[in-house]
A protein has these predicted regions:
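Short, solvent-exposed, polar/charged sequence segments at loop or secondary-structure edges
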Residues: 48-61, 65-109
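Multi-bladed beta-propeller domains
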Residues: 79-80, 186-203, 234-252
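C-terminal/domain-edge helix-coil "capping" segments
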Residues: 18-35, 123-194
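Amphipathic beta-strand/beta-sheet edge segments enriched in Tyr/Trp
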Residues: 85-146
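Beta-strand C-termini and the immediately following turn/loop, strongest in propeller blades
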Residues: 106, 166-176, 209-211, 219-226, ...
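Structural motif
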Residues: 111-113, 174-183, 227-233
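Conserved beta-propeller blade repeats
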Residues: 138, 153-159, 199-222, 241-243, ...
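A structural "domain/chain start" motif
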Residues: 17-63
Length: 262
C-alpha cells in the first residue's frame, strides 16, 4: 500500500495542472440550415377550376416537403407582378424577399408555367411549362417532373420526385401455391400499377438506370419460372421478359451500377 504522503504530494500538482489547462471545446455543426423557398400564391386565371388547380399545386407542395431539402413557406400573395419590373423599396420588405428562392407558379389556359425567382440577384428563371390534361392521375407525374427541374436548378442535381418504386406482392393461387407479381408505384405512393402477369414466383425487381424511354423503362428481377432462380430482364410496357444470363446454377440478388451499364 502506497504512503498517504505520496498522494498528498500529487494532489496540489494535479490541481495546479488542471487550473492552467482550459478545457478543449470542439464545436460540431449539428443543425444545417436549409435553403428557404417561398411558394408564391398565383392569380386565379387559366381554364381549370379552382379545385383542380389547388390539387395540382398541392402535389408540387408535397414534392417540396418530401424532398427534405428546402425550408418551405407558403405565401398568400402573388409575387410575380412585383418581380417583373424594377424592384420597389416597399416590396423588399415582404417575407418573400428574405427567402433564398421564390417559386412562381402560374396558370395560363390549360398550361402550368413554373418560374424560380432569386431575390439576391433579382433574377427570374423559367423552369418549365406543363400542358395539363385534366386527369390528375396523368398530370401528377408531370408535376413530379417539374419539381425535379426545380431541384436541379437549385442544387444542380436531379430530384427523385418523378422516380418510381418497384416491389413484389405475393398472393396465393387457386391451387394454394404462392405466386408473386411486380408492381409499380410513384414515389409518393400514388398510381399503383401491376406490370407483370405471371403465374410464377418473382422477387427483387430493380429498375435499370438511364433506361427510361418515354413512359417505359427496363428492369431486372429474379424468377423461379424454371425451378432454379434466374435473373430476367423486362420492360414496363411489355408483358414478356427474357433471361439475362446463360450461367448455370442459382442466380440471386442482381445489382447494377449507377449508370446501368454494369
Amino acid at each position: 500500500m502506497r504512503n498517504p504522503l505520496f498522494f498528498a504530494m500529487l494532489l496540489p500538482m494535479f490541481l495546479l495542472s488542471t487550473s492552467k489547462t482550459p478545457p478543449i471545446v470542439v464545436p460540431l455543426e449539428t443543425v444545417k440550415s436549409l435553403p428557404s423557398l417561398y411558394f408564391s400564391d398565383c392569380s386565379s386565371t387559366g381554364e381549370w377550376g379552382a379545385n383542380y388547380k389547388e390539387s395540382i399545386l398541392e402535389i408540387l407542395k408535397d414534392d417540396i416537403d418530401a424532398s427534405f431539402h428546402l425550408d418551405l413557406t407558403m405565401g398568400k400573395i402573388d409575387i410575380e407582378p412585383l418581380v417583373s419590373g424594377p424592384m420597389k423599396n416597399p416590396s423588399k420588405e415582404l417575407a418573400a424577399f428574405s427567402s433564398d428562392f421564390v417559386l412562381l407558379p402560374k396558370f395560363e389556359g390549360k398550361t402550368l408555367i413554373v418560374k424560380l425567382y432569386e431575390p439576391r440577384f433579382h433574377q427570374t428563371h423559367l423552369i418549365g411549362k406543363v400542358d395539363l390534361g385534366g386527369t390528375l392521375v396523368e398530370d401528377r407525374q408531370k408535376i413530379h417532373q417539374i419539381f425535379d427541374l426545380v431541384h436541379k436548378k437549385i442544387f444542380h442535381q436531379e430530384g427523385i420526385a418523378s422516380t418510381r418504386i418497384l416491389f413484389c406482392k405475393k398472393t396465393e393461387d387457386i391451387e394454394g401455391d404462392w405466386i408473386s407479381d411486380i408492381y409499380e408505384v410513384q414515389q409518393d405512393g400514388h398510381n399503383l400499377k401491376k406490370i407483370t402477369s405471371s403465374q410464377n414466383y418473382l422477387i427483387t425487381p430493380i429498375m435499370i438506370p438511364n433506361s427510361k424511354k418515354g413512359e417505359g423503362y427496363d428492369y431486372v428481377f429474379v424468377s423461379y419460372e424454371k425451378g432454379q432462380p434466374k435473373i430476367f430482364k423486362g420492360n414496363s410496357l411489355s408483358p414478356s421478359s427474357t433471361p439475362l444470363l446463360s450461367l448455370r446454377g442459382n442466380q440471386l440478388l442482381p445489382a447494377l451500377s449507377l449508370r446501368g451499364d454494369k
